[in-house]
Amino acid sequence: MKLLAITSCPNGIAHTYMAAENLQKAADRLGVSIKVETQGGIGVENKLTEEEIREADAIIIAADRSVNKDRFIGKKLLSVGVQDGIRKPEELIQKALNGDIPVYRSATKSESGNHQEKKQNPIYRHLMNGVSFMVPFIVVGGLLIAVALTLGGEKTPKGLVIPDDSFWKTIEQIGSASFSFMIPILAGYIAYSIADKPGLVPGMIGGYIAATGSFYDSASGAGFLGGIIAGFLAGYAALWIKKLKVPKAIQPIMPIIIIPVFASLIVGLAFVFLIGAPVAQIFASLTVWLAGMKGSSSILLALILGAMISFDMGGPVNKVAFLFGSAMIGEGNYEIMGPIAVAICIPPIGLGIATFLGKRKFEASQREMGKAAFTMGLFGITEGAIPFAAQDPLRVIPSIMAGSMTGSVIAMIGNVGDRVAHGGPIVAVLGAVDHVLMFFIAVIAGSLVTALFVNVLKKDITASPVLSETAPTSAPSEAAAANEIKQPIQSQKAEMSEFKKLTDIISPELIEPNLSGETSDDIIDELIQKLSRRGALLSESGFKQAILNREQQGTTAIGMNIAIPHGKSEAVREPSVAFGIKRSGVDWNSLDGSEAKLIFMIAVPKESGGNQHLKILQMLSRKLMDDNYRERLLSVQTTEEAYKLLEEIE
């Protein structure tokens, strides 16, 4: 039986790839052929072809954002949230094997299909689709404004102010421009999720009107609440017009003229004459109330936000709190996102610390999992805690909620602010956090509370326990990729080269099973020489400078005895990877304290597409998350054995 699947989450960093990995592993265990297309932060990967869709027996979509299903009309289709793809992959595949899923007709014709959509909660899915496109605008705007204020701001009684004639004023204005797109993008892509392309224009127009109070005589706009209302109103108006029966002569112009024009008029006039002013008043009152919160009321809000963020670790409850904090950034209230930014990273960091402090409480594989979780927490990826919660929810979930609530309260009391819609120490390092010292105190305190709670609640492991197979540890790619995508992704078109697997860009000549270097610099030189002898480099010194520049930004040792030094340089002739093993290990300033033993060096030409190195990082880390695979790779003795194992990375 042949199955196909698509996975996608609002942010496209963690859940997308965890669900894909779990579906693939579950299919392997059940002896079923499956291909998984991922629609993540760097675009569509492993795209399903028309021939594959034609030959498939069933399709599984595990997504929390809108996925175009038109290509699956007439096929058996199971549509669920991405969390089900992570936690219940075998159950989903078993349903497909049993034929217990409906045939997809269209978004409007299939009753059973609509029933399936209701189970997935379409309102949440449409909302998260808008959020996923909105967040990059908040991140770009917040980072640019934070950098401009940090480097160009002058202290005044009103705080940091950038002089009008300063270069940094231009940077601040670019950041503000990014913020101005936030609500139109949110509304536009909510409508797009509901009505496809005909909903995009009316959604964006409605979002712009919602954000511009002058349309309805309001001093302030209707904010993100107005954007959400505009998105749903535009989407369902477009969908309603789309369903109207019209003469065949008019059908060709329906999606490009009739639907966008009339849906835009409906949402625009509704906001100007009916909705805009009342919603603006509600939003203004909410903003004033939040800004005026003091004492016990602000602590209560912090407790609620901390609990929501950690309760389902990237799920629907988490996303509602995250959306609230993100929206407040656009209104200039950074002290809501501050406690959220702290709460986001506490679950994975706290559990990583727990595995270090309570070694008798965790299996060796779980301790390795803890290292990966800790690393992911540094980059604000809450999902690193999911494997622990899946194995022991009754002890882990209360512990991480207690830690996140503690950290959020400390952050709220300390007036911690965050100008970027993201969390974890990475945002503090990038200068996006106000009151950095209190931020780190809150993170450390909350993480220690989580670690202590978990270790108090958990019993010592038995001599040789058998662990049930659950969701695997999240890929180190999320930590590596999060570090790489902290700058805005310029394009999701992802100019990828032809390589489909690692051995397309690595040859036996680029493998050294017994590295001789004693320091990280020695290892870098050794691998660069291999690349040079293979003809991959135009200049050894030029490429080494690119590698060292990258290391200065932060270590490329991602933990679990892995280092992935990489550089994009004019000194590189073609994309290549060199690999070496240092059996005794070498200090690489790893985030989890482990020495690097498996070293992959990535070389990419400067003029290549912006996502090539991210694709290679994902290829590597998806496989390297497998404890057994890393052990097998460390045990190879010859170049041939290593190359054969590397053939599995694709």
From Swiss-Prot:
Disruption phenotype: Cells lacking this gene are unable to grow with mannose as the sole carbon source. Deletion of manP results in constitutive expression from both the manP and manR promoters, indicating that the phosphotransferase system (PTS) component EII-Man has a negative effect on regulation of the mannose operon and manR. Changing residue 9 to A: Appears to be unable to inactivate ManR, since ManR does not show any decrease in its DNA-binding activity in the presence of this mutant. It is found in: Cell membrane. Induction: Up-regulated by mannose. Is under the control of ManR. Is subject to carbon catabolite repression (CCR) by glucose. Forms part of an operon with manA and yjdF. Residues 504-649 form the PTS EIIA type-2 domain. Coiled coil: none annotated. Keywords: Cell membrane, Kinase, Membrane, Phosphoprotein, Phosphotransferase system, Sugar transport, Transferase, Transmembrane, Transmembrane helix, Transport. Gene3D superfamilies: 3.40.50.2300, Mannitol-specific EII, Chain A. The modification Phosphoserine is found at residue 365. It catalyses: D-mannose(out) + N(pros)-phospho-L-histidyl-[protein] = D-mannose 6-phosphate(in) + L-histidyl-[protein]. SUPFAM superfamilies: Phoshotransferase/anion transport protein, PTS system IIB component-like. The active site is at 9 (phosphocysteine intermediate), 566 (tele-phosphohistidine intermediate). GO terms for molecular function: carbohydrate:proton symporter activity; kinase activity; protein-N(PI)-phosphohistidine-fructose phosphotransferase system transporter activity; protein-phosphocysteine-sugar phosphotransferase activity. GO terms for cellular component: plasma membrane. It comes from the Bacteria. The phosphoenolpyruvate-dependent sugar phosphotransferase system (sugar PTS), a major carbohydrate active -transport system, catalyzes the phosphorylation of incoming sugar substrates concomitantly with their translocation across the cell membrane. This system is involved in mannose transport. The EIIB domain is phosphorylated by phospho-EIIA on a cysteinyl or histidyl residue, depending on the transported sugar. Then, it transfers the phosphoryl group to the sugar substrate concomitantly with the sugar uptake processed by the EIIC domain. The EIIB domain is also able to transfer its phosphoryl group to a specific histidine residue in ManR, which leads to its inactivation. NCBIfam families: FRU, fruA, PTS_IIC_fructo. This is PTS system mannose-specific EIIBCA component. It comes from Bacillus subtilis (strain 168). The lineage of its organism: Bacteria, Bacillati, Bacillota, Bacilli, Bacillales.
